[in-house]
């Protein structure tokens, strides 16, 4: 396993590859959080006392992290589909015959980068969001009791999305197909769910990865949604199923 980890780390060593992923995730998270916080702060004067009391300052500040998931998912997907496309996967398997060991090493190294990107994105998004929300008197600051759990939930969410991307890449093996699938699950599905009748929207939404991510990073939780860590466990189940399927195909099919 040590050799496989060393090989995967060598592939990640080019600074531009890793730094671009982290920078893009942070940029997306900060930009979207800033826009959302600015819009909310500008309408703060029209909020009632009840609205202010129930306002989720932490969740609004971390709203942009959901935009970073696309960058993190693509990072995971491309880490494996590019190797299949260029023929490097066959070379990797010759150098390291244990295919599941190769997959495990790729998961560990890329999950580490996703964790760094997630931590940077969550902290930066929260800092910017709170700064803008303070103009409307809506900021809670870094002392909010729910903040550690929300930041931790955001990091775990992005790590799971990265691992899911690798699993999709191993299963599908083509960049375009895997990216389209991840975009559908993370972006399009939440929109399509809104056309369902009545209470079915709430029942279906709670199973969506994006809704799970929102709840993991919120201070006030939707009673119809999964609790934060329960939702992350559900997402972990999705990842595990996809990973088993991807690992099976990796072992059974030639690159």
Give the residues covered by each predicted segment.
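Membrane-interfacial segments
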Residues: 39-44, 84, 88, 128, ...
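Residues that define the loop-to-transmembrane-helix transition and helix capping
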Residues: 19, 100, 176-177
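Transmembrane helix boundary and interhelical loop/hinge segments in multi-pass membrane proteins
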Residues: 74-95, 99-100, 107
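Transmembrane helix segments
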Residues: 31-34, 175-211
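Secretory targeting signals
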Residues: 18-77, 103-171, 191-193, 214-237, ...
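Aromatic- and glycine-rich beta-strand/loop motifs that create alpha-glucan
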Residues: 1-27, 173, 186
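Helix-capping/transition residues at the boundaries of transmembrane alpha-helices
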Residues: 11, 81, 92-94, 165, ...
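Junction motif at the cytosolic side of a transmembrane helix
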Residues: 234-255
């Amino acid at each position: 396993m040590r050799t496989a980890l060393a090989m995967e780390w060598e592939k990640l060593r080019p600074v531009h590859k890793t730094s671009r992923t982290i920078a893009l995730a942070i940029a997306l998270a900060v930009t979207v959080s800033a826009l959302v916080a600015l819009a909310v702060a500008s309408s703060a004067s029209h909020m009632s006392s009840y609205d202010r009391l129930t306002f989720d300052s932490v969740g609004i500040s971390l709203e942009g992290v959901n935009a970073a998931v696309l960058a993190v998912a693509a990072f995971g997907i491309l880490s494996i589909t590019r190797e299949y496309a260029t023929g490097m996967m066959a070379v990797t398997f010759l150098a390291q015959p244990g295919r599941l060991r190769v997959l495990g090493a790729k998961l560990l190294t890329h999950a580490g980068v996703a964790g760094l990107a997630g931590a940077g994105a969550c902290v930066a998004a929260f800092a910017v969001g709170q700064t803008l929300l303070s103009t409307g008197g809506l900021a809670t600051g870094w002392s909010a009791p729910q903040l550690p759990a929300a930041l931790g939930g955001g990091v775990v969410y992005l790590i799971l999305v990265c691992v899911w991307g690798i699993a999709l890449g191993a299963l599908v093996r083509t960049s375009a197909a895997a990216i389209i699938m991840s975009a559908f699950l993370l972006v399009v599905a939440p929109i399509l769910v809104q056309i369902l009748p009545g209470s079915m929207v709430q029942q279906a939404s709670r199973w969506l990865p994006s809704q799970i991510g929102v709840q993991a990073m919120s201070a006030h939780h939707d009673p119809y949604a999964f609790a934060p860590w329960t939702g992350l466990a559900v997402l972990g189940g999705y990842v595990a199923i996809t990973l088993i399927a991807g690992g099976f195909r990796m072992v059974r099919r030639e690159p």
